[in-house]
Amino acid sequence: MPKVIGLTGGIASGKSTVSELLSAHGFKIVDADIASRQAVEKGTKGLERVKESFGEQAIDENGEMNRAYVGEVVFNQPEKRLELNEIVHPIVREIMEKEKAQYLSEGYHVIMDIPLLFENNLQDTVDEVWLVYTSESIQIDRLMERNNISMEEAKARVYSQISIDKKRRMADHEIDNRDTKLELKQNLENLLLEEGYIESHSEDVL
């Protein structure tokens, strides 16, 4: 029986890497970030509603969403973040549910890759939750390097989410990403073996 697994983790925890590894093992990935971009692509009703809510500046010269502008607005105005979520979330859910149903009908196990799964109370929409976690200091370092932001900004983004300790208590399974990519792969494959998804480790993990 195909399973639906919610994959989540703190910001900059390495969740995308785990998604790639799971895809290589034959899981089908339904990615919330990709669906969020599709929801406001050029010419969509979603983007038209963003324009109505955020004004002409929300659209760039190419007719696409001005992510820098919208991002700045929602960061500084919490009520605008709620407004954006009310526009985007229903469209994202529709895109993801359609994709999930297609994969399940084909007999695949499905990974619902949702960064804010717990924050949006979506744990009941999946069979179980797998959490990718790392240390807070690693999260902050990765964010500073990846997004070219200050330590204060990185900390603010980390602290804006539910704490990793609380998420660990809420998850069904954990995937430790505090060390190297090879060790991450080993930790993931240990879980896949325990749960019966694979029969042996990859050659580079042995």
Swiss-Prot record:
Keywords: ATP-binding, Coenzyme A biosynthesis, Cytoplasm, Kinase, Nucleotide-binding, Transferase. Belongs to the CoaE family. This is Dephospho-CoA kinase. CDD domains: DPCK. The gene is coaE. The keyword Transferase applies. It comes from Staphylococcus saprophyticus subsp. saprophyticus (strain ATCC 15305 / DSM 20229 / NCIMB 8711 / NCTC 7292 / S-41). ATP binds at A12, S13, G14, K15, S16, T17. It is found in: Cytoplasm. One of its GO terms (biological process) is coenzyme A biosynthetic process. InterPro entries: Depp_CoAkinase (IPR001977), P-loop_NTPase (IPR027417). Pfam families: CoaE.
